[in-house]
Amino acid sequence: MSLSLHLSGWPENSESRQRMLESSSSTNFVQHFVSREISNKERLLSLFRRLRNGLVLVLTPLFFGQMLNWEGPEWKCAYCVCIIAVYWMSEVMPLAVTAMLPVVLFPLVGVLDANTTAKEYMNDTNFLFIGGLIMAAAVEKCDLHERVALSVLRCVGSEPKWIMLGFMTVTALLSSFISNTATTAMMVPIGQSVVQQLISSFQHHPTNGERGRLGCKKMATGLVLSICFAANIGGTGTATGTPSNLVMLGQLSALFPKVDGSLNYVTWIFFAYPLMLLCLFVAWMTLVSFFLRDAPEKDEAVTEMLKTRYNELPRMTYAEKSVFVCFCILLSLWVFRNPGVVPGFGVFFKKGAYTDATSAMIVAFLLFVLPSERPDLATYIKKEDLKKRGCLMDWKTMQETFPWSVVLLLGGGFALAAGVKESGLSLLIGNSLSSIEHLPLWILQLLTMLIAMVITNICSNTVTASIFVPIVATLAQRAGHHPFTLMLPTTLASSFAFIFPVGTPPNAIVFGSGMVKVSDMAFVGGIISLELLVLTVLYMNSIAYLTLPLLEFPTWAIIANSTMQQ
């Protein structure tokens, strides 16, 4: 925040700001009047929000209530879906609380029984998510992610455009495996330090004029924007990178029970990582053209500062080494369970007995067992030393850092998908989309991605994927296209929330730094969104065919379709 105040000419020192405000009695009067007016506005806005929330909560079930009188279970399911979708998008209640409504609504209206609905909240995909988050929490606990970030950034040079590329690369890499929010929260302070160093060096050159000052301000904006954009893009790279990816995998199993293993952790990386890197490059080029045209020249002091920060890190601890080994073990288990090219170790188990969630939970269990300090038999004998020793992960850290609300949100999405399938609502939606099913595939991809991209900027990507993935799966099925051809781009588009600060937590963190205006984020974010939309459609109709079997309509989708039609 102090950096933005400095750039705008506002005194950084609180005493200086106070003297400026108290320079005259009229200033005090105006300040008091304005603060009173602002407080009145805040009270009115708060009252309006409470009234609006109450009206939405009460009127939404009444507005859609006529659906309950229509014949067929699909309309009862549609009634529940409409209520949940409105509550999610308006956020009249916490998202996780709304996600629990299927447990109440589905049994009451006769869509699913309570036991079947509740099972969806702790299915295999949700345990995969839980295991991945425990691994990420262990990485954050020992600060391994900071060491990785600084070790890469100190090698990128001192020119602003390469610094930006370094930040985006590190952020995308980390957000592929740990929380996008945690990655952004760690990278923004580092980015602010780098920008402060560049501006400090710029001020030592008195020949730089107003244009150079504005260039510094734009550079600061562009650099922190690149962090949140890279975090959103990086989450698409792996199946566990962001919750919306897991929503798609979970709903794939719910909508198509006989689906094969063609889309797993390994094949997702082969499919999505090249696209993620292409999207990252396009976003970087766009940010450079908008924010770094008048940036200061390269400054070796920045490189030295990053090297100094890296050298100030303590030696790699036993905990960091152990967590890194556990991380490698987890990746190896995910990769070699079913690599696709050759049979994996999964062939030694019955079908469904060992999944990616099994690997995640095995490593999560190890993190709670392995010590955080090097074992020493002599000290273990002493009881007082034994009490001081901890493990790589502990339950207190879990309670403080684990996003339980996201687990419920995922479960709510899976319950919705199960209800949509069992009630026949997916078939009803497919029939209603018959007018556009004959359009070329690339146009369908553009339309579905555009809708998902608009919605994800006003509500979470998990909610967006939960609502739209079943719809586009049915549309692809009716149009005779492989379901992946619409499900995958729609899922990816749900992560392309670059326009508003409320779109994703990384956006909100960057906006909270005080270095970004809403207009800056909205303008360049809108352009990048359209660029990535076109790039994804081109990728889906070219390179994607080399990574996934998308050319032929799968037998598991034909069987599901024929069953539904009967």
Swiss-Prot record:
- GO BP, sorted A to Z: citrate transport; determination of adult lifespan; succinate transport; transmembrane transport
**GO cellular-component term (any):** plasma membrane
Q: Does the keyword Membrane apply?
A: yes
Q: What parts of the sequence cross the membrane? A: 55-75, 92-112, 123-139, 162-182, 219-239, 268-288, 329-349, 352-372, 400-420, 439-459, 496-516, 521-541
How is it placed in the membrane, per its record?
Multi-pass membrane protein
Query: What's the protein here called?
Result: Sodium-dependent high-affinity dicarboxylate transporter 3
**What organism does the UniProt record list as the source?**
Caenorhabditis elegans
Give tissue specificity per the record.
Nad-1 and nad-2 are coexpressed in the intestinal tract from early larvae to adults, expression is from the pharynx through to the anus. Expression level is significantly greater in the anterior half of the intestine than in the posterior half.
What gene does this protein come from?
A: nac-3
Give GO MF terms, alphabetically.
citrate transmembrane transporter activity; high-affinity sodium:dicarboxylate symporter activity; succinate transmembrane transporter activity
Coiled-coil portions: none
Task: Provide the family line.
Answer: Belongs to the SLC13A/DASS transporter (TC 2.A.47) family. NADC subfamily.
Q: From which domain of life does this come? A: Eukaryota
Described purpose of this protein according to its UniProt entry: High-affinity sodium-dicarboxylate cotransporter that accepts a range of tricarboxylic acid-cycle intermediates with 4-5 carbon atoms. There is no interaction with monocarboxylates. Plays a role in the regulation of life span.
What keywords does the record list, in alphabetical order? Ion transport, Membrane, Sodium, Sodium transport, Symport, Transmembrane, Transmembrane helix, Transport
**Where, subcellularly, is it found?**
Membrane
